[in-house]
Amino acid sequence: SHCGPLLFLLFINDINQVVRNSNILLFADDLKIYKDIRSYEDCVLLQEDIEKVGVWCETNLMEVNTKKCFIISFSRNTTAVDYQYSLFHHKVSRVSKIKDLGVMMDQKLTFTEHVQLVSCKSYKILGFINRHLKEFPIDTFKLAYISLVRSILEYNCTVWSPFYQINIKTLEGVQNKFLRICSSKLGIGHQGYQYNYQELRKVLKLDSLELRRTKNDLLFLHHLISGEIDCSSLLEKFKLRCPSRSTRNHPVFKVDFHKTNYGFFSPIARLSRLANTYNDEVELFGTSRNRFKSQLKTSKLL
């Protein structure tokens, strides 16, 4: 029914009231309970909240599939607090990686496995459309690539955008494979296995995937600032820079210092640096979505 999803959300809307010691993330019927664990006492508090959620489910006559419940600890430390959590007297399985809303996350949040997963899937789909669209025009083949392959490579990329060259090249390799196929279809010559991918992208009017991720990051930030993405808790993490005197440079956001690559390339820091870098090329504040997209297309730096 049309009202079913809405009624379900209203029905479970009070589940956050039973969780007192932890935080929750709720998307439809997908619930995540999380807490910063620093000691054994924190584990006990998290277990109490898990049990309270179990009681809430029993009270509201909702069944929980314990086989689909998992525990994962996100930490870059070599040793983490180990605790056996349970639900309805059943041990909750502990995993080292988990797929959440289409993104594969490992314990250290490197997203390397996600890159490998989406690239492998994309290669298979690219091979499929190449076999079945051999006789179709190049425009049709390009449209199929954009719709079925590139969309997989860019899904939620603002969250997991890679910064190690090995992962960047892994993703770019999928599009390069597409470009090689197009080169053959168009009769564009090449020397052995050496292809001029930059020229092929110009012919097909495509950007590199790395450049597209940069544009998607800026577009995401624009949507967040303009209110198209309604998330005040995320917006407040960006710190506006208010200098006490006039300076030559005009950075928009203040970027905190990070000692590690993980912190330096984290989404908030990365998006803040991008906004500062392209501040003179694009206008994040007071522009419509279409106007901002036009600025991205005409930017000399992008």
Predicted regions and their residues:
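Short, conserved micro-motifs composed of acidic
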Residues: 48, 63-98
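Basic, alpha-helical interaction scaffolds
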Residues: 20, 90-159
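Short, charged alpha-helical motifs in flexible N/C-terminal segments and linkers
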Residues: 54-72, 167-243
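Charged boundary/loop elements
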Residues: 59, 67, 155-168, 259-302
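Short, conserved non-catalytic motifs in the polymerase core
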Residues: 1-7, 34-39, 94, 108, ...
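Catalytic palm subdomain of template-directed nucleic-acid polymerases
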Residues: 31-58
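Active-site palm subdomain of RNA-directed nucleic acid polymerases
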Residues: 5-34, 136
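Mobile genetic element proteins and their domesticated derivatives, centered on retroelements
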Residues: 4, 12-15, 29-31, 57, ...
